[in-house]
From Swiss-Prot:
Protein name: Multifunctional methyltransferase subunit TRM112 homolog B
Summary of the function given for this chain in its UniProt record: Acts as an activator of both rRNA/tRNA and protein methyltransferases. Required for TRM9 tRNA methyltransferase activity.
Subunit structure: Interacts with TRM9.
Expression sites by tissue: Expressed in anthers.
Any single Pfam family the record assigns to this protein: Trm112p
Residue stretches making up the TRM112 domain: 2-120
GO molecular function terms noted in the UniProt entry: protein heterodimerization activity
Disulfide bonds: none
Xref: InterPro entries: Trm112 (IPR039127), Trm112-like (IPR005651)
Family statement: Belongs to the TRM112 family.
Amino acid sequence: MRLIVHNMLSCNIKGVVNKFPLRIEAEKVTVKEVDFNPDFLRYMFAKIDWKALVDGARSMEYTELPDNAPDTTTLESDETFLRKFHHALLELHLEEGSLVCPETGRKFSVSKGIPNMLLHEDEV
């Protein structure tokens, strides 16, 4: 599971208010190379929750992203930053581990890179 996917997932348990971001508990992380596309990264930047991305990357042992989101000038001119953003967003893969609801602590397993977000009957 890539961090771009993680950034769009939330806990859907009935009655839960604090659904996002899911905390990552990584057991196995891999890196899979993806073609670098600066235009795609600039487009996606506005759609990404920066703090969730940084926290997710750090939980996967990647610490190259700044705490605060950069400004648009950086996006246009700093290829080094774009490559770090690209690596975190698209190349880091959570292969095995869990996603944890911030409110309930419910763990959703990730196996072979696929998050299991199915709920139990009492959670629907």
